[in-house]
């Protein structure tokens, strides 16, 4: 839904929500909410994406947060983490100050993830834990935002069972947070503002970045792939690319501010530029432009194999600041399962892509995502995933048990793989993941690698930690002054998922800002 199409800015759910009786809440979503529905969601609007470069917070809202504090709890992916940075930026522009003490915060926001059932259960548990705070301090505001807010079943559950929540808003209208807050302060009922699947591209939103070493940079929003297990196309909307000049300007500003690494974000970054109607411009072109900017390291995530072009491979192969690490989710190694998943590629085409990548980028580190126990997955089909892992030799993988999500096509399939079978398969897969990770790590012993030092180790404050360009965790002892810098470290010991080493020296990146 574009800004001018919005017919209602919010919905107040009246005091009747306190009643325990069952009730039809669908009427509250008219005009501002469209529940996840594959048939409807695939009917992507033909309207051109509207770009708002003139975003400003109305002066009447400035000062709203004076002498008030906020706390944001974030679940989920990097996109959610970046959304939290934007939400924090808006709140600070309103006068609020961040706090880490949930017991004293005046505004508590839970930025949610809808990708797996376990994540949703954690959120509901979190909301429930806040009920006592609302009783003790009725003037605080509690809000739920993020992907779960885009699901009608979730919002219904909050309306019926969690009266301690004051506001619910979605992924498309974060820039309306000042108005939502004002409404929540004035209203005696819950404020719900959840927009449709369309969405605009809003530039110049304030941000409070987490740290000054690494930064997220959105290059696009939404996804049009509609993998049958995934709720994201419903919660994040259609694919919308930012203009390349806006992205490049943001990266240049980050370079001037001294950031050492950026990650280009999108639900499917390989689709970048397909919706730009006035120019032919893709991720390869964007990477080429950013490679000329003085950011020592540039990453991108997440990739879909279907859209990975030879042009992108060629640009990455040129080296420079584009790191030789590609995360390429495969999900399954069996063609029948891939077809049911709606992945749009085959085992053979995936392996062909891997071959082309390795031929052009011999030093590449490939990692992946895999789902175990998809509906109807047989033992033989699962074993094809294991053999594909052997053929590729991934250096790491994020592995998951299949989690049924309401509103997706897969939710209509019978989840007929027993839980004990899923867990046994996951255990076998993870054993293989650990085996290949150990092989990859062992190759570093005795080598000197460049590490971006990010801070102290989680296990020992006297030890520093950082990552190589291939995203390998390295622990080493060095002066605290090295935090935020690129350093050389000699690897003394290779563990299964991390490396231990000795500090050698600081590295000065030889790049010129353009």
Curated annotation (Swiss-Prot):
Residues 209-440 form the Radical SAM core domain. GO terms for molecular function: 4 iron, 4 sulfur cluster binding; metal ion binding; N6-isopentenyladenosine methylthiotransferase activity. Keywords: 4Fe-4S, Cytoplasm, Iron, Iron-sulfur, Metal-binding, S-adenosyl-L-methionine, Transferase, tRNA processing. Residues 68-186 form the MTTase N-terminal domain. [4Fe-4S] cluster 2 binds at residues 223, 227, 230. Its cofactor is [4Fe-4S] cluster. Binds 2 [4Fe-4S] clusters. One cluster is coordinated with 3 cysteines and an exchangeable S-adenosyl-L-methionine. Residues 442-505 form the TRAM domain. SUPFAM superfamilies: Radical SAM enzymes. InterPro entries: Elp3/MiaA/NifB-like_rSAM (IPR006638), Methylthiotransferase (IPR005839), Methylthiotransferase_CS (IPR020612), Methylthiotransferase_N (IPR013848), Methylthiotransferase_N_sf (IPR038135), MiaB_methiolase (IPR006463), rSAM (IPR007197), rSAM_horseshoe (IPR023404). It comes from the Bacteria. It holds the Pfam family Radical_SAM. It catalyses: N(6)-dimethylallyladenosine(37) in tRNA + (sulfur carrier)-SH + AH2 + 2 S-adenosyl-L-methionine = 2-methylsulfanyl-N(6)-dimethylallyladenosine(37) in tRNA + (sulfur carrier)-H + 5'-deoxyadenosine + L-methionine + A + S-adenosyl-L-homocysteine + 2 H(+). [4Fe-4S] cluster 1 binds at residues 77, 113, 147. Its EC number is 2.8.4.3. It is found in: Cytoplasm. Residues 1-21 are annotated as: Disordered. One of its GO terms (cellular component) is cytosol. Monomer. Catalyzes the methylthiolation of N6-(dimethylallyl)adenosine (i(6)A), leading to the formation of 2-methylthio-N6-(dimethylallyl)adenosine (ms(2)i(6)A) at position 37 in tRNAs that read codons beginning with uridine. HAMAP family: tRNA_metthiotr_MiaB. Belongs to the methylthiotransferase family. MiaB subfamily. NCBIfam families: miaB-methiolase, MiaB/RimO family radical SAM methylthiotransferase. This is tRNA-2-methylthio-N(6)-dimethylallyladenosine synthase. It comes from Staphylococcus aureus (strain JH9). The gene is miaB.
